């Protein structure tokens, strides 16, 4: 994904305000052993790009003065109540160094999963993205999660995912194989089953 940017020589609160008033957004690109570079981008183009999932999880080609640098979107600041991007941070990437990036999960075959189609269960997404480690060339835009064989009451874990070549998932918090999604019994059916069980227990209870 290509991003056209322009070098900027001034910085500070006043300069940034004037830049935004002219329809531009201040930004910085840093990392990969090179000096940080102050840049500016067209605000409207940036605002719409931020709505795209791929903009957050892809290697971006940032063109400045005819030269292209590969980078990741690392941070951005939005105005509290205006549709305004205040600042953006990009991090350069090296083709030979692994990067850590959060990648979205795309869930497939939810409607045809046995637990939904036959058991009338409810799909619960426990994770919506995962942090991966890989070389920039191997970075996927998303990872597919196939729920096509999941039965009611079953859970899909990180270890069950099919990962692209060269990609590993980083886990945190001590759980090496966290849950990704499951199919649960609807709350109404749980209550009905509990009532039926209680009624059956009452019928089986001997008279006093």
Swiss-Prot record:
One Gene Ontology molecular-function label: 5S rRNA binding
GO cellular component: cytosolic large ribosomal subunit
First and last residue of the signal peptide: none
GO biological process: translation
Top-level division of the source organism's lineage: Bacteria
Quaternary structure annotation from Swiss-Prot or TrEMBL: Part of the 50S ribosomal subunit; part of the 5S rRNA/L5/L18/L25 subcomplex. Contacts the 5S rRNA. Binds to the 5S rRNA independently of L5 and L18.
The protein's role, per its UniProt record: This is one of the proteins that binds to the 5S RNA in the ribosome where it forms part of the central protuberance.
Protein's UniProt name: Large ribosomal subunit protein bL25
Organism encoding this protein: Ralstonia pickettii (strain 12J)
